[in-house]
Amino acid sequence: MASHHHHNHNHVCSRHQNHHNNTPQFATSPNCCNKSNHPSPPPAEDNLLHLVATYLQNHQQETQCSCETSCQNFNVIRSQNRVLRQHKNVPREYDQVVLSCLLRKIDDLESSLNKFSSFYDKRRDRHSTLRDSAARVIQTHFRSYLVHRSISFRQLKELAMIKASFLSLKSSVSGKLIFPFKVVSRKATDLLLQLDSIQGRIDPMIRSSKRSLSRDLVRFVQYVDDCVVKRYGFVVKSGSGIKLNGKKPQGFGTSSEDEDNNADMSDDSEEVPVSSIDKRKVASSKSRTGVVIEGDVVKPPVMKFVVLDKNRNVCQVYGNRHDLTSSAEDDSVDGDEETLVMSRDNGRKQSLKARNGVSVKGGGGKTTRVVKTVSFDENGNVCKVYGDTHDLTSSAEDDDSVDVGEETLVMCRDEGKRRSSKTGSRVLVKGSGGKTNRVVKTVSFDENGNVYKAYGDTPESSIISEEDDSTSGSNEGNGEEKGNVNEVEEIKYVPKENESFEEEEEKETDSENEVSSSEGSEGDKRVTKKEVQHQKGSLMFSPPLPLKMEP
């Protein structure tokens, strides 16, 4: 305000000097002084002049001023009056000056503010760049941490899957001497490859887990390889002396056929153990050759193995004590052999011999050996037989025969009890000393060749039909009665194709069954059988049921 007032005062003074120079000088005379002592009243519209005049009139008596002073005051008053009038009529220069000053100051302030703002912006940009870079670095490290953690989680998941597969594979093999070696070895190798595929930056925990799991897998693969070597050596040792029709079978003996043996024991092949009897009492009588021998045979336990090929047909049978032999000139089997599978189809007879052998002979010049697929239950007993692979061999003398249409499937023994799954008409079981036991079975087959019913001579049916009689033993030209020991077993329940069945246990017969009657001029015989059961060391005879006569 002081500067503004000073500026205004200077401006008024300059205007007053200019006006004083332009106006003529008044004469300083007494008349002028008189006139000045009695001034005319100011106009009503001029308030300023009126105030000045009033002030002068009030102080006229008190102060006496000279003429010059009064003239100067009067000139000042007049100049002020003129200035006011000019301000009313003309655009005010004062306002313009003030506005210009204000505008200039505003410009100065803006320029200073712009400089300060530019400096602040530069400083702010510098600080924001550092903050952004720091945030960028933090985000980068955090994202890399998330990536590494996700990789670790994925590797942990893969390790868990590999370990679960390994434990499942190990549990399926543990406690078993025989298993598909190639399948297990290939699966273990695949697990090792999957374990090796876990690479890159690995967490220490994952690294230690991977190391331990790899060590376990390598040990398991070595164990499987050792089992394969042991089994292969056992098979070669057991089959070194085996001959079929004067030739060594495939898969035994020669190095050129080792690959075929391994191919047979491939992924789909199986080795099935079959346990034999510990003790067995054999009651024998006259066979067709007329030899009658009675006695006891004590047989040590023997473990046998049956190897099934891809088509589930029996391709190898071997044990751990004796070799398998088969001669084209003699179809009989040694006393220590036992027949696993006996089959016959369309007038051709077949046999696959192992231990405690079974001999089936016919009247043809050739026999057809049919290998049946054998399925065993948990106890090592036969539960299913199927398949029809043929093998032509030459036959020898036909002392004993099985009629056309018969099919002898399986004979097995367990713990002194005779088990027979299914037979066609009869099977000759030969032990040591030429003793024979005849077992007669009636078998019904379905369309697929599977057995769905098997039964024998039970107390409910004491007489066998003529067809079974002709099958069981007709001998032309021989009128003598022969004491044949016929064992009859009843199978009350035979399951279907996909079910395993358990056969009823029957006790052995210790004495001969009497065979009496001969019919007709043709020499056919009707055999009436009597069962002799051995219970608690005493003989109990069950007579046949009486025949019902139709009216």
Swiss-Prot record:
Entry keyword Lyase: no
Lineage top rank: taxon: Eukaryota
GO molecular function annotation: calmodulin binding
Regions of compositional bias (Polar residues) in chain numbering: 20-38
Chain spans, region Disordered: 1-46, 246-281, 414-433, 450-551
BAG domain span: 147-228
UniProt-annotated location(s): Plastid, Chloroplast
Transmembrane segments: none
Transit peptide: 1-52
Chief location of this protein within or outside the cell: plastid
Annotated GO CC locations: chloroplast; plasma membrane
Stretches with biased composition (Basic and acidic residues): 479-499, 522-534
InterPro entries assigned to the protein according to its UniProt record, in alphabetical order: BAG5/6/7/8 (IPR040400)
Domain annotation IQ: ranges: 131-160
In-chain residues carrying the UniProt-annotated modification Phosphoserine: S332
Assigned keywords, A-Z: Calmodulin-binding, Chaperone, Chloroplast, Phosphoprotein, Plastid, Transit peptide
Bias-annotated ranges (Basic residues): 1-19
Keyword Transmembrane annotated: no
Residue ranges, compositional bias (Acidic residues): 256-271, 500-513
Subunit structure: Binds to the ATPase domain of HSP70/HSC70 chaperones.
This protein's domain notes: IQ domain mediates interaction with calmodulin.
Role: Co-chaperone that regulates diverse cellular pathways, such as programmed cell death and stress responses.
Protein name: BAG family molecular chaperone regulator 8, chloroplastic
